[in-house]
Amino acid sequence: MPLIWAALALAIGVPIAAAAGSEQLAWRGPIYILAGFAGIIALGLVLVQPLLIGGYLPGLSAYRGRRAHHWIGGALVIAVVIHVAGLWITSPPDMIDALTFASPTPFSPFGVIAMWAIFAVALLALLRRRLGLRLRTWRIIHLPLAIVIVAGGVLHCLLIEGTMETISKAVLCAAVLAATVKVMADLWRKRTLRGESIARR
């Protein structure tokens, strides 16, 4: 197995395994636990997305990478819905406070903002052809929303003191940020080189 696949599996698998061994689970109900792990998986999927679109995962062609990016995006939406629905079932007042930005917890607004950005990207992806969005326009819209998703998701995760183990959580968040910065830098470099090539003609 190529090292990058092994590193990806560890970056996502270790935090999940560490959370599964948390003593705090003893005081949590099954729905709350499901919601929590859906949140961890969602952050793991956020890590996969830039790796796919940047073509960094060996064995995947550009076409397969884009297709996988779309499917992982759908899985991310499902994970977020399970996360939010589970928390709503276990504590409706807390979720109402979070969704209305009235929660006293510092991590709530970042999670809510990231959630709406994820839903916005998913909706636009579904309606892209109907709206007649060109690839360039789609990227202009998608990139800022992706940044919001990454920043909001990472801050939401880091500020929560829950079942996730501190070090593995920090490593996962750092990996998400690093992958996002890497793909953005590479895309910017490609556009710059393409612009220079066109200007020379």
Which sequence ranges carry the predicted segments?
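Membrane-embedded alpha-helical bundles that constitute the cytochrome b-like, heme-associated redox core
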Residues: 1-201
